[in-house]
Amino acid sequence: MITERQSNILNLIVDLFTQTHEPVGSKALQSLIASSSATIRNDMAKLEKLGLLEKAHTSSGRMPSAAGFKYFVEHSLNLGSIDEQDLYQLVKAFDFEAFKLEDVLLRASQMLSDTTGYTAAILDVEPARQRLTGFDIVQLSSHDALAVLSLDESKPLTVQFAIPKNFMNRDLLVLKGIVADRLLGKDVMTVHYKLRTEIPQIVQKYFTVTDNVLDLFDYIFVGLFRETIFVSGKVAALDYAGLATYQFLDEEQRLALSIRQSLSEEEMATVQVADSSEPALANVTLLTYKFLIPYRGFGLLSLIGPVDMDYRRSVSLINVIGQLLAVKLRDYYRYLNSNHYEVH
């Protein structure tokens, strides 16, 4: 446990270092702390011994360690003010007509990345918490067709596929009927289970050759089990982390899993400082904010950046963007659920 003065010294060093990225000496703190330079140096030495500060190689000053940033986040972090120009740009960015949910999610991810200079990711509702509420097959030609799936009565998913060579005209209707009878209305986890257990047995009753039918089921439904994730600002990772992190950001399903694991069921927001079990994220900071997607559940907005980021500004920005996102989604779903056709 550190004293109140030591806590104030650590907070000031964090604030000064994130602004200048230069080591902080006792003289720089003397006008801000009502203590002598010797007392401040003594407290800085104690903070260093606790692992909260570390020496710079080229200066007598000190800078926060990863543990120091973590202590600051857990004990002293509060929201900073947002520049009026930043706020204006954010509000302006969300003033657009969205034609689908993905438009809104992508815009939020881009704005968080653009305003911070770091990497941003946004996730839709967790697949396991969604339900299959609609299914249809539209035959496009004698050789190909389009499967149209609906999740939570609002999110469409389309899959174009080649019709198996041994399919007869009625077989697409049979496949559609199996889905309607056995999978429609079920949550995604149940759909996954039935595709592995029940559906193969049912397919045997209707089809002589079953392998390609089961392959087709897998092809059509595999998208249900993938996270919907948008990542912006990947290239920035080369500056604040390195090649391993940059390459990891392309593995979007693994990234989505790491983001979900950073936040417990009860938490609405979290700041993870160099504390991820994923090696590619072990030396970066991961800020995650949970936001409501009306009628469907919660999505996640995340910022990935360096341990020495400006936490007050970053947390304030992710909160503001999260709030603007919630308002935009509320209006979007209100429009979807309204009778917007007018008869004159």
Curated annotation (Swiss-Prot):
<comment type="function">
    <text>Negative regulator of class I heat shock genes (grpE-dnaK-dnaJ and groELS operons). Prevents heat-shock induction of these operons.</text>
</comment>
<dbReference type="Pfam" id="PF01628">
    <property type="entry name" value="HrcA"/>
</dbReference>
<dbReference type="GO" id="GO:0045892">
    <property type="term" value="P:negative regulation of DNA-templated transcription"/>
</dbReference>
<keyword id="KW-0804">Transcription</keyword>
<dbReference type="Pfam" id="PF03444">
    <property type="entry name" value="HrcA_DNA-bdg"/>
</dbReference>
<dbReference type="GO" id="GO:0003677">
    <property type="term" value="F:DNA binding"/>
</dbReference>
<protein>
    <recommendedName>
        <fullName>Heat-inducible transcription repressor HrcA</fullName>
    </recommendedName>
</protein>
<keyword id="KW-0346">Stress response</keyword>
<dbReference type="InterPro" id="IPR002571">
    <property type="entry name" value="HrcA"/>
</dbReference>
<dbReference type="InterPro" id="IPR036388">
    <property type="entry name" value="WH-like_DNA-bd_sf"/>
</dbReference>
<dbReference type="InterPro" id="IPR005104">
    <property type="entry name" value="WHTH_HrcA_DNA-bd"/>
</dbReference>
<comment type="similarity">
    <text>Belongs to the HrcA family.</text>
</comment>
<dbReference type="InterPro" id="IPR021153">
    <property type="entry name" value="HrcA_C"/>
</dbReference>
<keyword id="KW-0678">Repressor</keyword>
<keyword id="KW-0805">Transcription regulation</keyword>
<dbReference type="InterPro" id="IPR029016">
    <property type="entry name" value="GAF-like_dom_sf"/>
</dbReference>
<dbReference type="InterPro" id="IPR036390">
    <property type="entry name" value="WH_DNA-bd_sf"/>
</dbReference>
<dbReference type="InterPro" id="IPR023120">
    <property type="entry name" value="WHTH_transcript_rep_HrcA_IDD"/>
</dbReference>
